[in-house]
Each structure stands twice: as C-alpha cells, then as structure tokens.
C-alpha cells in the first residue's frame, strides 16, 4: 500500500482538504470529494494502487474560457468553428456555467487574456486542423499569452539545480484546472484510429501531443477531446452540433 499512500499524497495538493478517499471501493475506484474549484472527480487506480486517472463527474458551476480559433483562409471560411464556439457558449451557459471568450482572429489584449486563464477552471480550444496541427494564429496566441503569463501561469520549467534532469514541465501554476480541444478536420476519424491508415492508429490526441503538453506545462490536465470529421467532403453540421452538445453535457454536466 506504499504506492497508494504516495499517490494520495500527490493528489492531496490538487484535491484539497475536503477530499475523501475510500480504498478498496468496487471496481478499484477511489472516491474523492470536491476539488477547490467546486468540481467533483473520481479516481480509478490499478490493482497495485500505483496508477490512477481522473474521470469527470457532475459539478457545480465551472468557469470556462472559450477560445475561438476559427479563421478564414484558403478554401476555409472558418464558419464551422465559429458555429461550434457559439454552440459551446450557449450550451454551457444553459447548463449554468460561467463563460468568457476570445475570438482569436479578432485580436486580443495580453494582460486580459492572462487574467482569463487565471479566472478559468477549464479552457476549450476550438480550432480547425491545418497541416496536421493548429492554425498559426492559435499557436501565436498560445506563444504570446503563455509567455506574458510567466510567473502567473507557470513559475519555471519545474527543475531545480539540485536535480537538473528531473521534473521538467512541472512548474505550472494552474494545477487542478483543465483544458479541452474541440477540433474540425476534413480527415475521417478512421485516418486517426485505424492501423495502417495515415496516422497509424495513433489516435487524435497523439497528433496533438505537443499542444496538450503546452497546456500541461502551465498545469492543466486534459479533458476528452471532441472532433468533427470529414467536414469538407461530407459535412454534417446539424449532427456535429448535436454531438457537441452531448459531449459538453457529458464532460461538464449541469451546474
């Protein structure tokens, strides 16, 4: 049980004093209480109580930052991403959550954007897949805002002079908060998930590993990704909206 105690100690900084732990619960679930931001989580651990992962449950209201990375460029007008951004705003507010937003292509004020990250419990990055990654405007936004947030969003890279090879990426100050990707791709889902296809069965999140890691560098953890596929050759906008609302309900739940 030594590993379980070590994991619990690691979790305590995120869960806070109100966390409740039950070892040996059915299915290997460690039941925990409310996080500091009001959200509820369960922790599932492995047989040896040495591995765990978070599963999103219902919550009180959550402060959610919505970032619209849609952009008109080439054959893309950006409308689908704007529509999904607006769908998220309406659906989350209807569920009782609080939202702030930035339409990246319309410009932004760096101190205000840093303040939004300090305010949020979760951030949703809405963006198309361009040449196997985010649009340059979204990456530029991340570069500028995260850099402007030095000392507020992250303290350092997590290492110390005593252990210069250990702890890289652990200096984030937004621990206990979360990030989610909402993506639009012309590629079918099978291009990501099917072995032998373009991405070799690696999955969507593997394609976005650097983007996830950039968010994790400031301390956030990953929520389930949402993706709309085949958006140019076989668009199903009404179904995308229905699916997205269901995804948001599953991830965040009503306040």
Task: Annotate each predicted stretch with a short phrase.
Residues 1-52:
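Hydrophobic alpha-helical membrane-insertion segments
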Residues 65-67, 100-102, 124, 180-182, ...:
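Hydrophobic/aromatic beta-strand patches that form the interior of the parallel beta-sheet core
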Residues 111-211:
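Helix-loop-strand module that forms the ligand-binding subsite of alpha/beta enzymes
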């Amino acid at each position: 049980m030594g590993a379980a105690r070590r994991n619990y100690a690691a979790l305590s900084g995120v869960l806070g004093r109100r966390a409740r732990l039950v070892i040996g619960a059915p299915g290997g679930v460690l039941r925990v209480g409310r996080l500091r931001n009001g959200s509820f989580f369960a922790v599932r651990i492995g047989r040896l109580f040495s591995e765990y992962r978070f599963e999103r449950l219902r919550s009180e209201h959550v402060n959610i930052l919505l970032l619209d990375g849609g952009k008109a460029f080439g054959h893309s007008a950006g409308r689908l991403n704007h529509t999904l951004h607006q769908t998220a705003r309406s659906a989350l507010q209807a569920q009782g959550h609080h939202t702030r937003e930035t339409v990246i292509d319309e410009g932004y004020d760096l101190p205000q954007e840093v303040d939004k990250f300090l305010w949020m419990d979760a951030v949703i990055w809405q963006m198309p897949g361009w040449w196997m990654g985010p649009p340059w405007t979204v990456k530029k936004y991340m570069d500028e805002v995260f850099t402007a947030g030095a000392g507020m969003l992250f303290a350092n890279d997590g290492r110390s002079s005593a252990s210069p090879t250990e702890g890289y990426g652990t200096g984030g100050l937004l621990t206990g908060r979360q990030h989610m990707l909402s993506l639009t791709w012309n590629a079918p889902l099978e291009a990501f998930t099917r072995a032998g296809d373009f991405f070799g069965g690696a999955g969507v999140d593997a394609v976005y590993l650097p983007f996830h890691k950039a968010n994790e560098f400031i301390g956030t953890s990953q929520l389930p990704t949402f993706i709309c596929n085949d958006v140019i050759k076989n668009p199903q906008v009404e179904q995308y909206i229905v699916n997205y609302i269901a995804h948001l309900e599953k991830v965040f739940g009503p306040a």
